[in-house]
Amino acid sequence: MNDENKLIIYQVFTRLFGNNNNHCINNGSITENGCGKMADFTAKALGEIKKLGATHIWYTGIIEHATQTDYRRHNIQPDHPAIVKGKAGSPYAIKDYYDVDPDLAKDVPERMREFENLVQRTHRSGLKVIIDFVPNHVARQYHSDAQPDGTSQLGSNDDTNYAFSPYNNFYYIPKSELHGQFDMKGAAAEPYREFPAKATGNNRFDAYPNITDWYETIKLNYGVDYQNGGTCHFDPIPDTWTKMLDIMLFWAGKNIDGFRCDMAEMVPVEFWEWAIPQVKEQYPSLLFIAEVYNPGEYKNYLFRGKFDYLYDKVGLYDTLRAVTCGYESATAITRSWQSLGGIEKRMLNLSLIHI
């Protein structure tokens, strides 16, 4: 890669940028602590980011995720507080794949329009737009109120009598209620109920997720029967594959320039091999960046999975940290890049892991 094509990505946690409240309180609400807005990325602000040498800006937390903020007046179903991490919620517990986080909008009913305007401002500033695509898991109370007509809800046609079915969108623990090993009530009057329990996002296939699990999320089913030797059921194409492809095409149609694919290695490489070329057929310049932490899978996701880039967290980042802390000598840096075996130009280096 020559310098003209070199990517320099500026990551920003969108809800923090522009929030000038210097007196935030622990566990405070959006009213008490405030929240950054998409409108805070003015032409001036974006111009300053461009001056840093950035080519792309990765807006973290754009897609609507679970939150304890009540938006029922805007016809957004509330989330039970027991399954939301923090008041604002995790940006990786997606609640509606087809919508924008209302916290980020100055005018909530116009949140999608505000995002489209943000993309336009970013492009006018000479920067390209990357957003997260979170394919492995969703919020426990996922419900899309913005999905296009003719689109079915995730899980709406699932047969919950089966722990695994290649036709289901989720994995289930049949005839079992969720018994989370965490506060199942939170600030609510009644505890959270889930029957039958669904498998938790970090591949926990029982009804007892604990506080260290991704307990606020549920695992999506791409046709892999993990509890029976990881057998794959990819013919016919699983319904989840089709739904995820449609979601990527929806956001690609908003003129974004790339997806940073969260925990891409927890989704079978066969899905990416099938989906990415179909997206690129319509949007050939769209970038796909994968979060993969197993070096043994790097080439698989690059060459078979068709990703453009991976980011080198367990290689260079961890090595630099070890050298800085005195656990390794500087020669470890050379060993790190040599271990990539010729794919270093497709690895993104970072100084901080994402929030």
Which residues make up each language-model segment?
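Structural preference for beta-strand elements that scaffold enzyme active sites
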Residues: 7-11, 56, 126-130, 258-260, ...
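Conserved small/polar residues in nucleotide/adenosyl-binding loops
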Residues: 353-355
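Aromatic- and acidic-residue-enriched segments that line the glycan-binding/catalytic groove
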Residues: 65-90, 136-212, 303-310
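Active-site-proximal helices and loops of the catalytic beta/alpha 8
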Residues: 137, 149-150, 159-180, 243-351
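N-terminal small/glycine-rich loop or linker at the start of catalytic domains
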Residues: 3-30, 204-233
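Short, acidic/polar
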Residues: 35-49, 235-252
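Short, well-ordered alpha-helical packing segments
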Residues: 46, 98, 115-123, 131, ...
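N-terminal structural segment of carbohydrate-active enzymes
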Residues: 1-128, 136-138, 143-147, 159
